[in-house]
């Protein structure tokens, strides 16, 4: 029978803490929401980030984390669970170390909380399951491996214009409702299908409904068996939401270090991590910084991002969804996160409104991997030309809106036509949306994407319908769609001609 995480923290840590560190049991002296002050009489205090276990009669124990030493005999801790029912005078047990979460094969296919407790309908974890602390440093610089290998996603616009690095960090920036979570789910699908690696998903401060839907979708698609889901939901205390990425990182680091397996680490949403940190900062009495964020914003983001690293033989590839409040890309949280990523995938509300999914802005998105030494000369040349054509089209949109496209010169009209076709060609159906759209998902090789864009830039598709290039995979798929449309037009014209021919004599007779 499985023990609760809080029980394991207490069982594994209390004897060690009291014997080795001399920390005696404490007692609660104040409760202010999620902040709990604890007094210790032995003269030795638990270290910062150590876990404390607070038993409650008739309820699961509360796990808290030490964040400040108030005096020689008291600490301030942050509860990772609801503190309802907690009273002054309650006993507190020090564990002698940071929170430890389960890792290894036992957690594959499971949904876990910030403390590693299963949140699905599966069996309890065994008491002897391997565990790792959530607080660890980044690998030494000498052991880290730079990210230069391409991480092909099968998503045309990403692979062409903002390629991801295997072992690198990529962030998808966008406001509410532009498709960040759908992109994350598609990338999980790509990882399982293409790389046969492990995926670790951290749901940070997101809706419970979305987490439930993702769990069911993964079960249905068969990818859950190689995925670990770690959730700190929107309704949980800020401490839980703040520590969820560290729990996910501890699990990913285990598979990287102990199993030498490639790991795809997905975090949705990193902005909620910053938001939870701001709440924690306020609860602990720190003065806010710009726009109300915590004064330690930059260091907290850096501590998280620098742990995402690759070593010889195994890579952790991080893909992070970042909510942009009020579509303001100058927000301090957004700029702090952007400073650490290799690839920036910017989602556009305007493109989403036009139905251009994935709604990725081809001009604003960028990647340090878009370099001839990494992806090759041909790739870079096509990417630059695609960006140039689409950017020129955007410059002409105001003129078109005022005067109409017929007032443009021949060269500008040609650029407009090719830019619109490129925008449509860079859309594609996703496997994870097949149940809603009825259209099978398409995964496209980078070579096919480059060849298709080069053909459009060359003018090979100037006489094609724009709709033939919309929501297809390769250019061959678009060609078949165009041929089918032309055949349908020919049949319709033939039927119309036959109908008008048969109506001709009758019309003449009625005229007489």
From Swiss-Prot:
- Chain residue ranges for the region called Disordered: 479-512
UniProt cross-references to PROSITE patterns, sorted A to Z? ATPASE_ALPHA_BETA
Residues recorded as binding ATP, renumbered to this chain, are 174-181
Alphabetic keyword roster: ATP synthesis, ATP-binding, Cell inner membrane, Cell membrane, CF(1), Hydrogen ion transport, Ion transport, Membrane, Nucleotide-binding, Translocase, Transport
Q: Name one GO cellular component term.
A: proton-transporting ATP synthase complex
Q: Where in the cell is it found?
A: Cell inner membrane
Pfam families of this UniProt entry? ATP-synt_ab (PF00006), ATP-synt_ab_N (PF02874), ATP-synt_VA_C (PF22919)
Instruction: List its EC numbers.
Output: 7.1.2.2
Membrane topology, from the record = Peripheral membrane protein
Catalytic reaction equation(s): ATP + H2O + 4 H(+)(in) = ADP + phosphate + 5 H(+)(out)
Q: Which terms in the Gene Ontology molecular function aspect does this entry carry?
A: ATP binding; ATP hydrolysis activity; proton-transporting ATP synthase activity, rotational mechanism
Enzyme class per UniProt = translocase
Basic and acidic residues compositional bias: what residue ranges? 479-494
Q: Its function? A: Produces ATP from ADP in the presence of a proton gradient across the membrane. The catalytic sites are hosted primarily by the beta subunits.
Which family does the similarity line name? Belongs to the ATPase alpha/beta chains family.
Quaternary structure per UniProt? F-type ATPases have 2 components, CF(1) - the catalytic core - and CF(0) - the membrane proton channel. CF(1) has five subunits: alpha(3), beta(3), gamma(1), delta(1), epsilon(1). CF(0) has three main subunits: a(1), b(2) and c(9-12). The alpha and beta chains form an alternating ring which encloses part of the gamma chain. CF(1) is attached to CF(0) by a central stalk formed by the gamma and epsilon chains, while a peripheral stalk is formed by the delta and b chains.
What is the recorded name of this protein?
Answer: ATP synthase subunit beta 2
Task: Give the organism the record lists.
Answer: Burkholderia thailandensis (strain ATCC 700388 / DSM 13276 / CCUG 48851 / CIP 106301 / E264)
